[in-house]
Amino acid sequence: MANSGLQLLGYFLALGGWVGIIASTALPQWKQSSYAGDAIITAVGLYEGLWMSCASQSTGQVQCKLYDSLLALDGHIQSARALMVVAVLLGFVAMVLSVVGMKCTRVGDSNPIAKGRVAIAGGALFILAGLCTLTAVSWYATLVTQEFFNPSTPVNARYEFGPALFVGWASAGLAVLGGSFLCCTCPEPERPNSSPQPYRPGPSAAAREPVVKLPASAKGPLGV
């Protein structure tokens, strides 16, 4: 049967990864400006995410603005949005399936084989969610790196990796690792009972020999 301890470990790892995927999707710090300004008093930090761009001043004031148009966004931002939203949805479905399929829950106890397969399906969806997140974050980071090292990019327009990218990488790793643990707990199919049958001794040799009855005329005077 499936190892319930390994299932619980995989579930909580994948659940933490899914929460991190949600946080990475919502955070606006996918890339941050590496130029602080010439004057410390007027320094402004710029952040950009999938849904908004923010500016934080040295006084602590932060102003954020949502992107006005969906069609006006760059293709990599739209692709990253789609991948992250798909990852969040896959993680939600995987969470439900994993709860139903884990051995420690009471749902579907009458069919442990089907219950184990449901847990494996949940683990596979967690892995897909992690891969979607890993693709979106890595693709975005690659473009940020290319823009940073592009000689034609002005110094005040160069960006570096934001905290959301690191959260996304860590969350993707947790989701893939937890989903792998759930997939590794596949229950073995039940085998027919092959226990040896109890030994039953056959009839004795004396019992197997036929009994010959003599006719009455062949008996002696004493009846023998």
UniProtKB/Swiss-Prot annotation:
GO terms in the biological process aspect are:
actin cytoskeleton organization; bicellular tight junction assembly; calcium-independent cell-cell adhesion via plasma membrane cell-adhesion molecules; cell adhesion; cell junction assembly; negative regulation of cell migration; negative regulation of cell population proliferation; negative regulation of gene expression
Effect recorded for residue 20 to D:
In HOMG5; ER retention of the mutant protein; more than 90% decrease of homomeric interactions; loss of interaction with CLDN16; loss of cation-selective paracellular permeability; when overexpressed in the retina of PN0 mice, leads to retinal degeneration characterized by altered morphology of bipolar cells, shortened bipolar axon and dendrite lengths and decreased light response; no effect on interaction with CLDN18
Coarsely, its chief localization is: other
Q: Which GO terms describe its molecular function?
A: cell-cell adhesion mediator activity; identical protein binding; paracellular tight junction channel activity; structural molecule activity
Q: Which organism is it from?
A: Homo sapiens
Tell me what topology the record assigns in the membrane: Multi-pass membrane protein
Q: What is this protein called?
A: Claudin-19
* Disease entry from the Swiss-Prot or TrEMBL record: Hypomagnesemia 5, renal, with or without ocular involvement: A progressive renal disease characterized by primary renal magnesium wasting with hypomagnesemia, hypercalciuria and nephrocalcinosis associated with severe ocular abnormalities such as bilateral chorioretinal scars, macular colobomata, significant myopia and nystagmus. The renal phenotype is virtually undistinguishable from that of patients with HOMG3.
